[in-house]
């Protein structure tokens, strides 16, 4: 015990995903493709929105920031995870662990409130169409983007500071593939109940607050859509929200499973599997959800490809 108290942890080791070499190959190739698709999809969405003037409206302003957050959150985790797959000692420094958690937490919380901002935007567009340009001014849109980043920063600073000022003087093997809060706290040489309660309370408050904004917005949207007489009008109105609802359901369901349910319900190993979904898969899915189910994005893609094709054809002729 004396040796445990005198040892200060300067680095952590990850257990990783699997020790089977054949599975490692499969996982590496799978998540390399997922990561490349994430970067291609999200950066492509940002470039498309920037280049196509018809997409210079609030809805796509928020979507470009969502794509930026997805690309960043995936880049915080995936490169390190991929480089560790074939390595026996999956090591990260104490400071590196704190930075990884800090950045990832920032982007996850920001994404939750960006989705809330997008829900409010859809509410105004469908329920108050005549006042849309007045309400969703450039100033309001900027505020609805700065707000999520600010809330994410505050939440992250609280959790990172409270977790990494604890003494770590014993085991330094994290049962995970990245520095998530609960696996790190399990290694602390102090009582972590306060930290776990803080995580549960803040995750609950932030989740409920952003969730209420989304829920109330969609209740009003649903009421308005049901008042539309034509079936075609109802279908068009709902189609503008379906992509957003899909993204919200996937993200909130996964985060609730990890952070809000009682910690004793499932093991850290199950958390690890679920974490793969929201660290790697969700950032990849969002741009495809919004592009495949959105006519304006598909039309913008077609216009971009046609423009590029025409330019290349002109160059060949000239």
From Swiss-Prot:
Residues 47-54, 121-133, 218-237, 293-318 are cytoplasmic. Its main location: membrane. Keywords: Cell membrane, Disulfide bond, G-protein coupled receptor, Glycoprotein, Membrane, Olfaction, Receptor, Sensory transduction, Transducer, Transmembrane, Transmembrane helix. The chain crosses the membrane at residues 26-46, 55-75, 100-120, 134-154, 197-217, 238-258, 272-292. GO terms for biological process: G protein-coupled receptor signaling pathway; sensory perception of smell. Potential odorant receptor. This is Olfactory receptor 5G25. The lineage of its organism: Eukaryota, Metazoa, Chordata, Craniata, Vertebrata.
């Amino acid at each position: 015990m004396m040796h445990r108290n005198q040892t200060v942890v300067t680095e952590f080791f990850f257990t990783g995903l699997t020790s089977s070499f054949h599975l490692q190959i499969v996982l590496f190739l799978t998540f390399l493709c997922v990561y490349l698709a994430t970067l291609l999809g999200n950066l492509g969405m940002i470039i498309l929105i920037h280049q196509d003037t018809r997409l210079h409206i609030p809805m796509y302003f928020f979507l470009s920031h969502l794509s930026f957050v997805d690309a960043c959150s995936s880049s915080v985790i995936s490169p390190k995870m991929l480089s560790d797959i074939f390595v026996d000692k999956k090591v990260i420094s104490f400071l590196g662990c704190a930075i990884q958690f800090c950045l990832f937490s920032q982007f996850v919380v920001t994404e939750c409130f960006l989705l809330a901002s997008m829900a409010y935007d859809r509410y105004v567009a469908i329920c108050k169409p005549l006042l849309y340009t007045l309400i969703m001014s450039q100033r309001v849109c900027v505020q609805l983007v700065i707000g999520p980043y600010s809330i994410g920063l505050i939440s992250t600073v609280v959790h990172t500071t409270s977790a990494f000022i604890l003494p770590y003087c014993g085991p330094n093997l994290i049962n995970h593939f990245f520095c998530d809060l609960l696996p790190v706290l399990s290694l602390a040489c102090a009582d972590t109940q306060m930290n776990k309660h803080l995580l549960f309370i803040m995750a609950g408050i932030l989740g409920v607050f952003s969730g209420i904004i989304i829920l109330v917005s969609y209740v009003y949207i649903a009421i308005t859509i049901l008042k539309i007489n034509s079936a075609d009008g109802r279908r068009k109105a709902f189609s503008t929200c379906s992509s957003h609802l899909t993204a919200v359901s996937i993200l909130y369901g996964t985060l609730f499973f990890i952070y809000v349910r009682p910690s004793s319900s499932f093991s850290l190993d199950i958390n690890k599997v679920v974490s793969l979904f929201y660290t790697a898969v969700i950032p990849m899915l969002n741009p495809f959800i919004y592009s495949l189910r959105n006519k304006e994005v598909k039309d913008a893609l077609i216009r971009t490809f046609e423009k590029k094709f025409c330019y290349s054809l002109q160059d060949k002729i000239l």
